[in-house]
From Swiss-Prot:
Transmembrane segments: 9-28, 38-60, 72-94, 104-121, 128-145, 150-167, 174-196, 211-233, 240-262, 272-291
InterPro entries registered for this protein in UniProt: EamA_dom, RarD
Membrane association type: Multi-pass membrane protein
Pfam families per record: EamA
Subcellular location(s) per record: Cell membrane
Keywords on record: Cell membrane, Membrane, Transmembrane, Transmembrane helix, Transport
Disulfide pairings: none
Domain EamA: 18-141
Family of the protein in this entry: Belongs to the EamA transporter family.
Chief location bin: membrane
Record protein name field: Uncharacterized transporter PA0485
Transcription regulation keyword on record: no
GO cellular component entries: plasma membrane
Length: 298
């Protein structure tokens, strides 16, 4: 049974990260639609699809618990704005030739989490964690020196997702209900935008009779299915294994950027990636070594 659960965990985890890693292929199908319009539609269809999913959610007490702690709605509203900002930056990057920067941002994210833990949660870093953060900082500094500006796409993606995770710690709601409630709280903003500011393709009635409309509607399941797979995988896999699997998504994005969409990995970018990869190797080794030192059950 344990082996079967582990195998199931690997399949589910790989499914989640492969879907996340292939997001650029999906968003390229919507390339003519502005990023903000895609995100508004994504919020709407995720809210609707999420409502259907929650009808089958096995933990029905989540809504009662949320209503008994109304301050969590405020936290989820803030985290919803952060994840929407993350989504919009990512979609813009994919459809404007900045997939390499997007990939770099998600490579940096675990190290940003370490820094946020140190600065805001007063967590103490181990020596190898300090080394990993220093190497990542050198990678970012190298980009600033070469380009003359901050790699803002990478930093916005890493910081919004890092703060998103940090804020969600303040609202202990299961991942799926939490994300669905976030999209529900985004709905008023989305509807205002659709009613008063929408002037792109999806605002035209004729659009909804085209095949492209199906891809827009698919934003709901495309957003939520990998999250469901990830949550299920987390119940069957060691945390360290999930930590290693998370690098699959940015690696797939990196490969698509170079092999499919013609983005150039020049020596400057390669140097930055090398610093980040080395930092992640140090970080992963430190995490693995720390887990080995924990007392084993039984």
């Amino acid at each position: 049974m344990a082996t079967a659960n582990l195998r199931r965990g690997y399949v589910l985890g790989l499914t989640a990260y492969v879907i996340w890693g292939l997001f650029p292929l999906y968003f390229k199908l919507l390339e003519r639609i502005p990023a903000v319009e895609i995100i508004v539609q994504r919020a709407v269809w995720s809210a609707l699809f999420g409502a259907v999913l929650l009808l089958f959610w096995k933990h029905p007490g989540w809504w009662r618990e949320l209503r008994q702690n109304p301050q969590r709605f405020v936290v989820l509203a803030a985290s919803g704005l952060l994840i929407a900002s993350n989504w919009m930056t990512y979609v813009w990057a994919v459809n404007n030739g900045h997939m390499l920067e997007a990939s770099l941002g998600y490579y940096i994210n675990p190290l940003i989490n370490v820094m946020l833990g140190m600065l805001l949660l007063k967590e103490r870093l181990r020596p190898l964690q300090w080394l990993a953060v220093a190497l990542a900082s050198l990678g970012v500094a190298q980009q600033v020196w070469q380009l003359g500006s901050l790699p803002w796409v990478s930093l916005v993606l890493a910081l919004t997702f890092g703060f998103y995770g940090l804020i969600r710690k303040k609202a202990p709601v299961a991942a799926l209900p939490g994300l669905v409630v976030e999209t529900w709280l985004l709905l008023p903003l989305a509807l205002v935008w659709l009613l008063f500011f929408a002037d792109g393709p999806t605002s035209e009635t004729a659009f909804w009779s085209t095949p492209e409309a199906l891809w827009v509607v698919a934003a709901g399941p495309v957003t939520l299915v990998p999250l469901v797979c990830f949550n299920a995988a987390a119940r069957h896999l060691p945390y360290a294994t999930l930590g290693f699997l998370q690098y699959l998504a940015p690696t797939l994005v990196l490969l698509q950027a170079i092999l499919l969409f013609g983005e150039h990995l020049d020596s400057s970018r390669l140097t930055a990636f090398a610093f980040i990869w080395l930092a992640l190797a140090v970080y992963s080794f430190d995490a693995w070594r720390s887990l080995r030192r924990l007392p084993q059950p039984g």
